[in-house]
């Protein structure tokens, strides 16, 4: 079996469920050692237990730093390098959404989204990039969203934060290219995560009607895009925001 990430070391934030967990599994299946990061020890331990059952020979670890704490992030990334010998791939997937209307938005709600969806991406990318530069290169991948391009009628903090991620992605691609560090983002459309699965059918059906492929995306669909961008098959791809949405907004 051809393994696209053989002998690579990856960090995946927000890796305990949904898209992040699918990315972790896809990377392991393709030969990578993976450190999955989550917000709580309990969820990290549960994810590790599942992975060890599925992939008993895999090289995996789990961590739960506060991603807005620069010192914690730097320490954890350095630990990953010590554990596995390198940091080749960083996937900034951790994030939160909010559906509050603009008129009712509280400043602390907006700041919370910025902290995790933007500041955390900056912190993790900066710490990882320093190691990647020393190694001679690496890959940074960010989770964006199609609403970063088209907006949404409520919860403006989420699309605003993902638009910021797009800008950071493109800027870092230009700045870090000389150090052989590629930076891209994946912008998923409606994907069958826990959040979407909880929506009533009356909400889901109209959404599916807007998708030419006639279905919502699966986490594995998004994970496949991350796998491609992380691999050497995308060695000349950087600064891109790859939409994976079934042509919902094309």
Swiss-Prot record:
BP terms from Gene Ontology: bile acid metabolic process; fatty acid biosynthetic process
Keyword Oxidoreductase: yes
Top-rank taxon: Bacteria
GO function term, MF aspect, one: 3-alpha-hydroxycholanate dehydrogenase activity
EC number from the UniProt entry: 1.1.1.-, 1.1.1.392
PROSITE patterns: ADH_SHORT (PS00061)
Entries under InterPro entries matching the protein: NAD(P)-bd_dom_sf, Sc_DH/Rdtase_CS, SDR_fam
Keywords: Lipid metabolism, NADP, Oxidoreductase, Steroid metabolism
Catalytic activity: lithocholate + NADP(+) = 3-oxo-5beta-cholan-24-oate + NADPH + H(+); deoxycholate + NADP(+) = 12alpha-hydroxy-3-oxo-5beta-cholan-24-oate + NADPH + H(+); deoxycholate + NAD(+) = 12alpha-hydroxy-3-oxo-5beta-cholan-24-oate + NADH + H(+); cholate + NADP(+) = 7alpha,12alpha-dihydroxy-3-oxo-5beta-cholan-24-oate + NADPH + H(+)
Catalytic site: 158
Residues where NADP(+) binds: 93, 158, 162
pH dependence, record text: Transformation of DCA is more efficient at pH 10 than pH 7.
Pfam families: adh_short_C2
Family, similarity comment: Belongs to the short-chain dehydrogenases/reductases (SDR) family.
PANTHER family per record: 3-OXOACYL-[ACYL-CARRIER-PROTEIN] REDUCTASE (PTHR42760:SF133), SHORT-CHAIN DEHYDROGENASES/REDUCTASES FAMILY MEMBER (PTHR42760)
Primary role: Involved in the modification of secondary bile acids into iso-bile acids (3beta-bile acids) via epimerization of the 3-OH group through a 3-oxo-intermediate. Catalyzes the oxidation of deoxycholate (DCA) and lithocholate (LCA) to yield 12-alpha-hydroxy-3-oxo-5-beta-cholan-24-oate (3-oxo-DCA) and 3-oxo-5-beta-cholan-24-oate (3-oxo-LCA), respectively. Is also able to catalyze the oxidation of cholate (CA) and chenodeoxycholate (CDCA) into 3-dehydrocholate (3-oxo-CA) and 7-alpha-hydroxy-3-oxo-5-beta-cholan-24-oate (3-oxo-CDCA), respectively. Can also catalyze the reverse reactions in vitro.
Protein name: 3alpha-hydroxysteroid dehydrogenase
Origin species: Mediterraneibacter gnavus (strain ATCC 29149 / DSM 114966 / JCM 6515 / VPI C7-9) (Ruminococcus gnavus)
Gene responsible for this protein: baiA
């Amino acid at each position: 079996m051809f393994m696209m990430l053989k002998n690579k070391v990856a960090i995946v934030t927000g890796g305990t469920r949904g898209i992040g967990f699918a990315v972790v599994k896809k990377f392991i299946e393709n030969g990578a050692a993976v450190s999955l990061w989550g917000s709580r020890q309990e969820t990290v331990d549960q994810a590790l237990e599942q992975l060890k059952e599925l992939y008993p020979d895999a090289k995996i670890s789990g961590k739960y730093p506060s991603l807005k704490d620069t010192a914690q992030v730097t320490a954890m990334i350095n630990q990953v390098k010590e554990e596995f010998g390198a940091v080749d791939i960083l996937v900034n997937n951790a994030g939160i959404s909010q559906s509050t209307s603009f008129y009712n938005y509280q400043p602390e709600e907006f700041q919370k989204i910025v902290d995790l969806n933007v500041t955390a991406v900056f912190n993790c990318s900066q710490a990882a990039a320093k190691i990647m530069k020393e190694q001679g290169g690496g890959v940074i991948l960010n989770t964006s969203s199609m609403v970063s391009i088209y907006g949404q009628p409520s919860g403006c903090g989420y699309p605003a934060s993902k638009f910021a991620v797009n800008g950071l992605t493109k800027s870092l691609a230009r700045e870090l290219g000389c150090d052989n560090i590629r930076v891209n983002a994946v912008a998923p459309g409606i994907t069958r995560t826990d959040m979407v699965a909880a929506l009533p059918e009356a909400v889901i059906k109209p959404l599916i009607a807007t998708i030419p492929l006639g279905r919502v995306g699966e986490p594995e669909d998004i994970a496949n895009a991350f796998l491609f961008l992380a691999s050497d098959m995308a060695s000349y791809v950087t600064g891109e925001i790859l939409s994976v949405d079934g042509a919902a907004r094309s």
